[in-house]
Design a protein with these regions (language model features):
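Long, low-complexity, Lys/Arg-enriched
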Residues: 1-293
């Protein structure tokens, strides 16, 4: 079975399903949905995976993101905060939040256990925990694979799921997360087609259009494994754009199959690079009118 991870795998899943492949599944998941489900102890290593990830949020906003009832937090002042409205403005403030994880450890671990149980129910329903398979993700840093393997370890799952990525960027985070992992990339990674990486990095938003979905990101798994999405109603323009991408690929598939067309990654991304760097006047206007999807 090939599992296409939300939201990056939405387009490819629709195309594979349209082509009649039976062994494909769309996996509703996200980094947020897996992060808490992985945690069994509140040690330094685990706390490093938890928010806050950047300054600017209030203490209360971080707790809301984690679905923690503020009324159950009893050590706010001991951690160095005066109110839930206090803004985390510095690295020191972010470190202070870790004290809250320690002081109110059981409150956080209870939420982690609940999210793990609900995630377990969802993944059992997909069959992923019961059989080997392959997962597709757009990639860049390998976070989903790293989290999925952590979750599988937490629930005692031994099935194997190597990943296939569009590309993996070279960086400390990706090298750390993918160390010892089994994966393949199509476009580039640490060792393959390295010269393409700089060009992609400068225009990553355009490429990510191909790996988006009309639904919101998964927030967490509710009781019984129900999928809870982040607030939002989707975007009709995004839906229209994704349908156009899918239709274009479907129409071209018969030609590619009939004439056994093969191409290299470098040649494949050439037209998009031309569109980005040397658009015609008409194309430039059309791109300029695109909303950020």
């Amino acid at each position: 079975t090939v599992y296409f991870l939300a939201r990056d795998g939405y387009n490819l899943y629709q195309i594979f399903k349209h082509q009649g492949f039976a062994n494909v599944e769309y996996l509703y998941t996200s980094r947020r949905a897996l992060t808490l489900a992985c945690i069994q102890e509140m040690d330094e290593e685990e706390m490093d995976t938890l928010p806050p990830y950047s300054t600017g949020q209030t203490v209360g906003e971080v707790l809301d993101y984690l679905c923690i009832d503020r009324n159950r937090i009893t050590h706010l002042e001991e951690a160095g905060f005066h109110s839930f409205d206090e803004v985390l403005e510095t690295e020191t403030d972010m470190e202070a939040f870790k004290k809250l994880y320690v002081l109110d450890r059981e409150v956080f671990l209870e939420r982690c256990r609940r999210e793990r149980e609900n995630a377990l129910a969802y993944f059992h329903g997909t069959g992923l925990l019961d059989r080997d398979g392959i997962c597709f993700d757009c990639g860049w840093q390998g976070s989903s694979q790293w989290l999925l393997e952590r979750f599988k370890k937490a629930v005692g799952c031994r099935t194997k799921h190597p990943f296939v990525y569009f590309a993996i960027k070279d960086g400390e985070k990706s090298r750390t997360q993918l160390h010892g992992m089994h994966y393949e990339t199509w476009l580039f990674d640490f060792y393959k087609n390295y010269g393409l990486q700089n060009n992609i990095n400068q225009n990553v938003v355009m490429y990510e259009l191909f790996f988006s979905a009309p639904h919101e990101s998964v927030f967490y798994y509710g009781d019984g494994g129900t999928v809870i999405f982040e607030e939002g109603e989707g975007d009709p323009r995004r839906q229209e754009l994704l349908e156009g991408i899918a239709d274009y690929i479907r129409e071209g598939h018969s030609f590619v199959e009939k004439y056994e067309v093969e191409t290299t990654p470098e040649i494949s991304v050439g037209p998009l690079n031309r569109l980005i760097h040397r658009p015609t006047e008409e194309e430039a206007v059309a791109i300029g009118n695109l909303q950020n999807v």
